[in-house]
Amino acid sequence: MQAFTAEKTELLATYGADAHCGLTEAQAQKNKEQYGENALTRRKPDTLLKRLWDAATEPMLLMLIAAGLIALAVNIVRQVTGGEADFLECVGVFVAIALSVVISVVMEGRSAKAFEALSKINADMTVRAVRDGQTVTLHSAHLAVGDVVLLSAGDKVPADGRLLESTALRVDESALTGESFPVKKDSELVLTDEKTPLAERANMLYSGTFVTEGNGRLLVTAVGDATEFGKIAGELGNAEKSSTPLQEKLARLGKTITVLGVIAAGIVFAAQLIFFAFHGGLHLEAVMEAFITSIVLIVAAVPEGLPTIVAVSLSINIIKLSKQNALVKKMIASETIGCISVICSDKTGTLTENKMTVRAFYDTRWHKEAAALQNEYLTHNICLNTTADLAPDGGFIGNPTECAMLRFFEQADTGNTYRREREDHTRLCAFPFSSELKHMTTISNVDGRILSYVKGSPECVLDMCALKPDRLAELRRVLVQAEEQAMRVIAFAHKELAEMEDFSAKEAHRRMESDMVFDGFVAIADPLRSDVYDAVAACRSAGVGVKILTGDNIVTATAIAKELDLLADGCVALEAKEVEEMSDRRLQKMLPKISVIARSTPTVKMRVVKLLKARGDVVAVTGDGINDAPALKNADVGIAMGISGTEVSKEASDIVLLDDSFATIVKAVEWGRNIYENFKRFISFQLTVNIASVICVFVSVLMGLPAPFTALQLLWINIIMDGPPALTLGLEPGYSDLMRRRPTNRSENIISKGMLARITATGVYMSVVFLLQYKLNFLGAAQGEMTTVLFTLFVLFQLFNAFNCRELHSESIFCHLFKNKLMLLVVGCTFVLQVLIIQFAGAFFGTVPLGIAMWGKLFALAFSVIVLSEVIKVFARLFQKKKA
């Protein structure tokens, strides 16, 4: 049985309640046992162990753990068999793993604490209910199904229920349905269709919504998890978040590196066996050594610094975003936001302020400034013909439309307040607004004159006025102009009465509301946030599409979309019912051209998000209402409003905007894109080193040459590869053209074709030069200097190549050379350390001091890697120019 289709008497009997006396305490306790408490089941927070496990089971970390265990096993075998073990490599891998896990857990723990502080659970909410025939004040958590609750303007509805009585009752359901205007409720309405949409159930009230005017008696029919609010919260708790694009790409990269590492190791192993066979040294010990060398090669191919740079970069971005009023709950979201290609945004409270505002008024022409409000009949009508009020903090008490007009009057600076206007002019009689009459009337004594003030729908009020046909036609044109901009227009008129009489009599009432004087229109709307225009324009230039999915009607939604220029280039606005009638295939095909979906439901939002992701889009969903929560949870990035947002929407999101500013999203996108580019810089650097080292080891084995580096020299090279010089690539500031590039596709590899070409060319070049020096000694190194020269050449190659890796596209490295000052400092310090190692720590590192001439040769030769890169980029720019 659905509460909205059942008779009131039937429901009262079912719950053992009386319409006037409510529940007895005994029945209330019985109902609590049967239907549950009025509290949501809160999901237990993850334990520290669970958070550590989640952080350690990222794809790249799993690959690192495997590499570390293999390296450990190999070195144990070496130790047991009397060989030279190097446990420093193992320590390096496991330190990198621990660092990444700790940073992830600590940063997400900080965000979780901040979120707990932000969340305000409605534990202190009290309600008026009827128990044992007495009106009592109860804690909302103590309500039971069957309780009769008394509600009036300003109250928050504590549970779902069927209306028993209602008087001029209107409720703000924007958090649940997305409808921006308060909805009229009717206790006498009986619905027969069990499929009636939630937004059209006028005989029901729902938990989490607000009474804006009127009063009513509510029979509670659902509490806690059984409410519409609770059902959505429950679904969110059970939903699993899908992997993010970065996680997917890093997983693919990890698999690729592993496969290539295994292939390279297999080739090296086979080459060593062939070499030993030809030279008569093929025995078990040689095979074992060849196998260990191959395994070490696999471990060397793994970029163990990558998880650390990911964790550090994400942490820095979280701190940056927190300073810009964005709380990142899930660390990975601070990068994912940079990859988004579509934002599915709610309208009410996200793009708009969710506060009714007077946009303009009309007397003889339209005025936007409150200071122009000089017509005393219009001002008296606004102040006297209303039941609304403004709170001391500026909040609305009563009908939002009437409150907006009172605020507008206060801004007019007439030298008077609306409260003083009410005190100075006695109200004699009032006829409240009704949906049937579509207007309200107040009769007041104004300076000794009896004046009737009426306001309401323009059609109704214009019919009451004595207007010439041409004036009436002109006013209707004015009216259409305002309505086309999705503004709600209220008309005003007045009439001076000869004397006070009983105007409730039908004939007297008709005379009072005829031959009135038209005073003007007031146009009201929920205005767009001031920063939304620039934010949407920035999204457009960044290639990020914006779609409005709102519970509002098609006219309002279309007007907002036009104001934001979202319906250009053949884009359309549709209603949810049109979307529901489409097949998945047709809808997926049309989605690029659909900019607005009006009367949207949670189901439609979820379907749109799912199909956008299937197309390869990376989707962000913004919202503040309960109805936004499922889509927030299932999007790649869910963004909730921190001020106007409901607790359910915040719980479901990945990022909470503490200032409710849509513009903050644009900043987050920019920083997220920068993080992604920095990952690519770091990966480019590491893979170049890997390719160079693999080729050097492979060819050295084939040529029968001894290992070019000692264990300590390898450790120093590893520090450069994974340490500060490499990490500073992950801190490269964003470039000015970052928000003019297209977003990365979900299926796009983290290593582009251009990157792969540069990585391969640079890696091969460094290897060839290194091996030529090893074999031919074209630098003319003395007999005892060869190891030192090779070691220094390899290190300098990596330091200069770090500058190449700063530019991912075809720009010259000299364009932004001084932008990352930290990198310049770190690379400079590393070079100084290299000089000190060579010149003064030879006994420890197995090197000998080099002369100035040799240092000059090495410096010039290593710098050639930059020259090579710049030449390649010149040709790339010429090719791009020719292609354009």
Language model features: what each stretch is:
Residues 1-743, 748-751, 764, 775, ...:
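Conserved cytosolic headpiece of P-type ATPases
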